[in-house]
């Protein structure tokens, strides 16, 4: 499990630098039907992957041992309307069980305004897919671990392999970056002294306009 993986790599400290890999700069592919595109929607050297199968592999080198988040910058393609599902290998192996099934969310936006039914009740707007790039750090699909996965990697040469399970997307970038530092409560609460305590009337937000 991921918790066991992190416990086994407790000696690793957060990395100090990031590595960026272009989606189209993969070193190998296996039955993916993936296509390199010189440009798509403002991003260069991207990967178009719409076969729902196969794998692509990227080579990279790290200057130091450290913990890294892995963030994918992608844009969903119209397919079945489900979340994008893939798996990830480091140096040819799954680093932990949870890496075998990773979910990337689709983006949605309102299609039109709030509707009103024949009883006068307001209904949420219909949803339509928002086809623009988003950056998502890989994390537990079940929400057991809230923070993004932290991958423990030694300095030197490595490979990262993505295996597609479901849906289609344009992959613009893979970024290995230091985990974002989370301040402890004592540090955060110390900054609250700058704010005045609210003393006005309660603020009520209606469920309908």
Named regions from a protein language model:
Residues 1-209:
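Extracytoplasmic
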């Amino acid at each position: 499990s991921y918790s066991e993986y992190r416990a086994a790599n407790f000696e690793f400290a957060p990395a100090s630098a990031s590595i960026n890999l272009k989606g189209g700069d993969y070193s190998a592919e296996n039955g993916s039907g993936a296509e390199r595109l010189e440009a798509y929607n403002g991003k260069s050297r991207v990967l178009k992957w719409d076969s729902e199968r196969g794998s692509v592999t990227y080579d990279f080198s790290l200057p130091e041992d450290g913990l890294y988040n892995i963030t994918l910058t992608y844009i969903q393609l119209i397919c079945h309307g489900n979340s994008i599902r893939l798996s990830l290998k480091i140096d040819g192996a799954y680093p932990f069980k949870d890496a075998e099934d990773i979910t990337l969310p689709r983006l949605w936006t309102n299609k039109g305004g709030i509707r009103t039914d024949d009883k006068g009740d307001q209904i949420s707007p219909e949803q339509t897919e928002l086809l623009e790039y988003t950056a998502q750090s890989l994390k537990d699909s079940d929400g057991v671990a809230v923070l993004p996965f932290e991958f423990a990697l030694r300095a030197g040469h490595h490979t990262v392999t993505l295996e597609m399970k479901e849906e289609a997307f344009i992959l613009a970038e893979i970024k290995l970056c230091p985990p974002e530092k989370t301040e402890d409560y004592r540090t955060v609460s110390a900054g609250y002294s700058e704010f005045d305590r609210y003393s006005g009337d309660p603020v009520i937000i209606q469920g309908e306009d």
